[in-house]
Amino acid sequence: KKFFNKTSFGSILLKPTIIYVKPLLKIIESINLKALAHITGGGIAENLSRVLPNNLGAVLSSKELDFEKNNSIYKWLNYECKVDTKEMLKTFNCGIGMIIVVSKKDLEQTIALCKTIKQPVKYLGKITNSKKEVVFN
């Protein structure tokens, strides 16, 4: 209960998945996307590296991930079940279901558009010249 406040564990597990098709279609109409990564099994690093060219990687902020926040199944797994943070990042999406890669010049417009269409959005980090390496700081 201390991780979920008044929400039951069952309710959290039964929360429906987000369907991204409609919001992504609206974003694609307005923004020149560089890549999309649907974060599924394999976690953030594996799924993001799949959509990046061989000469690019990424540096992401772990502070934006749900296992750092309250009311999170990921925080519960991390702390109560003692799942190591590195293992969390390799295995789970940690609350990030989709990553949109855009050029720096399109960043603010992308964030504004996501807010307009009521799609939660977080700035996770930046693309680097690190040859498919995705790291968290």
Per-region residue spans from a language model:
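Glycine-/charge-enriched secondary-structure boundary and capping motifs
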Residues: 2-137
